[in-house]
């Protein structure tokens, strides 16, 4: 528990910067695009999350685990895993780019009710190699538990991407917001390359070369889990927005997206700490009892924090809306209570689900992701038609 608190404190500055930048971006988007623009931005962000999840499948959790596990033996022990990740990432990137470009017109119609944004989806696809590069480097730093370097590069990337987003929104309105959302993770990839190419482990031979089958297959379960998440969770939220739009309006979808954005922002305090400390820590544990103890100790920190944070957001929701958005978003105040209850349940489920990633419990993880996404869509269809936009939050809590 002490280590988790220490890492949480260490990542506090990064978390605060990310929260601040998230608030600034939300305010700028609200002013220059309104609720309907917020909903459109949410749609493209879900696409970006899905595509990024696909290409990052080989370079994220599996690399964190194996880097943490083999780092004590030196870079030479980690390099085969890194090379395997690069091979997988190249194959998945080529497939993702080809499929997205081929179906860009159809996807644009599904997301935005018109085909004018096919070019935006092509832009998302073409940026994917840089995205997976950034994730690979971040995962290596995380796996090595180089927390200071992790915070440094995270801070720089956050400031750069936020600056690009704000400039594009102010200069070009909703079009600029959509382009910035499509490219921000590629910008992170460039920043990660610039900040890490002098690291002693950053050597071409560590990332490219012959790979034994056992390393490729060793990442296989992590790839299956990540691909499942990429193809279920973000796409389920697209279905949720489409259901809200079909039964209410783009404005209501934007109100819902605003509340969701607030949840994402304050929960980032925990997600950064868990991603930085919890997963690498689980990878080093060898016994069932040690893992159970780690889960219990983590929950002792996470549950009170989640409840207190959700309570603070609820009681100050009017002030939050006033600061972060505009008067057009006042209707969002009625959406907070159920959403925040769902957030508490969600963060607890994260703590419980992380051991599945650490131990590559593929079947259980895949089932849980598909089950969550499917029930979210089905409950949303039912509740939104009965209760309007509030129904989406009841579906999330359920």
Regions found by a protein language model. Give the residues of each.
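Interhelical loop/hinge segments that connect adjacent transmembrane helices in multipass membrane
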Residues: 1-4, 181, 193-235, 280, ...
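Signature of the first transmembrane helix
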Residues: 3-64, 97, 101, 161-162, ...
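Membrane-water interface segments that mark the loop-to-transmembrane alpha-helix transition
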Residues: 6-18, 44, 56-105, 119, ...
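Helix-loop junctions and terminal segments of transmembrane helices
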Residues: 27, 56-72, 143, 201, ...
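C-terminal transmembrane helix end/exit motif
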Residues: 28, 63, 138-143, 147, ...
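Interfacial segments at transmembrane-helix termini and the short loops linking adjacent helices
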Residues: 104-124, 250, 296, 314-344, ...
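Hydrophobic alpha-helical transmembrane segments
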Residues: 118, 122, 152-200, 371-375, ...
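Membrane-interface junctions at transmembrane-helix termini in multi-pass inner-membrane proteins
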Residues: 129-153, 341-368
């Amino acid at each position: 528990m002490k280590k988790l608190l220490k890492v949480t404190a260490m990542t506090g500055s990064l978390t605060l910067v990310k929260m601040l930048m998230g608030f600034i971006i939300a305010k700028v988007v609200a002013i220059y695009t309104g609720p309907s623009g917020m909903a459109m931005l949410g749609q493209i962000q879900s696409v970006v999350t899905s595509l990024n999840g696909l290409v990052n499948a080989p370079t994220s959790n599996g690399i964190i685990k194996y880097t943490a596990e083999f780092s004590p033996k030196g870079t030479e022990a980690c390099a085969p895993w890194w090379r395997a990740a690069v091979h997988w990432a190249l194959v998945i990137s080529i497939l993702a780019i080809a499929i997205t470009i081929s179906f860009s017109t159809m996807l644009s119609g599904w997301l935005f009710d018109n085909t004018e944004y096919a070019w935006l989806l092509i832009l998302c696809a073409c940026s994917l190699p840089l995205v997976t590069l950034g994730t690979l480097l971040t995962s290596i730093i995380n796996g090595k538990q180089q927390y200071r370097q992790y915070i440094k590069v995270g801070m720089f990337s956050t400031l750069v991407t936020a600056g690009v987003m704000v400039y594009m929104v102010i200069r070009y309105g909703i079009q600029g917001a959509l382009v910035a959302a499509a490219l921000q993770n590629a910008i992170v990839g460039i920043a990660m390359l610039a900040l890490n190419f002098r690291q002693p482990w950053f050597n071409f031979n560590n990332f490219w070369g012959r790979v034994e089958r056992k390393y490729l297959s060793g990442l296989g379960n992590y790839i299956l889990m990540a691909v499942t998440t990429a193809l279920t969770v973000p796409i389920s939220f697209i279905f949720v927005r489409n259901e809200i739009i079909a039964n209410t309006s783009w404005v209501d979808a934007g109100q819902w997206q605003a509340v969701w954005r607030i949840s994402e922002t304050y929960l980032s305090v925990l997600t950064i700490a868990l991603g930085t400390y919890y997963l690498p820590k689980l990878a080093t544990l060898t016994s069932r009892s040690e893992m159970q103890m780690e889960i219990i100790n983590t929950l002792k920190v996470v549950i009170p924090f989640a409840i207190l944070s959700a309570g603070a957001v609820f009681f100050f929701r009017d002030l939050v809306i006033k600061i972060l958005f505009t008067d057009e978003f006042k209707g969002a105040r009625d959406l907070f209570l159920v959403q925040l209850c769902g957030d508490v349940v969600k963060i607890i489920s994260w703590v419980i689900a992380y051991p599945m990633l650490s131990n590559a419990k593929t079947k259980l993880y895949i089932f849980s992701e598909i089950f969550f996404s499917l029930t979210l869509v089905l409950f949303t269809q039912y509740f939104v038609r009965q209760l309007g936009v509030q129904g989406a939050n009841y579906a999330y809590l359920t």
